[in-house]
């Protein structure tokens, strides 16, 4: 792309955008996009690794991150059941593949972050099994209700949602998986999962309810109080005997 092309593209964007249009060459612009999403992937992986460590030591990772982020030069993102969408799970893969293919060595931070984030659904399954075992219930044959199966809150986009491997692994271990998501009428990625329409009744009946995505429409406290057991992977539920956090 020539400098003249860049100037004209910038002029076009300024017609309908209020933000600053910064011009650079196409290779740097592409690398910038990959870098942004890879950095977020690494940051989320750090938060997820922290959540594993804190769970083993009885530390509230959400409080820990909130306190650490009071430092003006610290900005740790939030842990969760995995990463999703068409950017964070994809761009770091593209970047690390090209580094290996063209330069002959690994992009170690990015590859480790991908490994950590990819294991989170399996970790959630293991924690779910532990919670049920505490109630003298096996995972096999238990009903697990997933709340929110999109990749981020308040949208219908399911691309690369961590809810997919989470549900698939629960089913593989013999659990009956149900889901509730007002944004998703037909969860084609996991056809074995049963969609429920009566949220309150489903939460009350399920052996374990897992908050996977925190849509604004969810009254988390009411749902947690109704549930037999409530596994909060987003750190939003208040403490109670029924609630277990990631």
Language-model segments: residues:
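Structural/interface elements that position substrates and couple domains in central-metabolism enzymes
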Residues: 1-246
């Amino acid at each position: 792309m020539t400098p003249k092309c860049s100037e004209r593209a910038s002029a076009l964007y300024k017609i309908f955008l209020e933000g600053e249009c910064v011009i650079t060459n196409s290779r740097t612009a592409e690398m910038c996009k990959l870098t942004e999403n890879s950095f977020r992937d690494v940051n989320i992986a750090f938060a997820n690794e922290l959540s594993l460590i804190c769970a083993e030591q009885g530390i509230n990772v959400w409080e820990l991150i909130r306190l650490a982020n009071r430092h003006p030069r610290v900005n740790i993102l939030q842990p969760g059941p995995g990463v999703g969408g068409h950017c964070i799970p994809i761009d770091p893969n593209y970047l690390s593949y090209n580094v290996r293919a063209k330069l002959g060595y690994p992009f170690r931070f990015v590859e480790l972050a991908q490994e950590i984030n990819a294991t989170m659904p399996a970790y959630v399954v293991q924690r779910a099994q532990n919670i049920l075992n505490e109630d003298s219930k096996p995972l096999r044959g238990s009903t697990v209700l997933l709340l929110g199966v999109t990749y981020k809150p308040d949208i219908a986009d399911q691309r690369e949602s961590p809810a997919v491997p989470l549900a698939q692994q629960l089913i593989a271990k013999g659990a009956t998986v149900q889901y509730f998501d007002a944004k998703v009428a037909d969860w084609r990625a996991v056809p074995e999962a049963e969609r429920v329409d009566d949220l309150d009744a489903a939460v009350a009946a399920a052996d374990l309810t897992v908050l996977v995505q925190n849509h604004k429409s969810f009254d988390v406290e009411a749902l947690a109080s109704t549930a037999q057991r409530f596994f909060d992977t987003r750190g939003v539920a208040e403490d109670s005997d029924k609630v277990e956090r990631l």
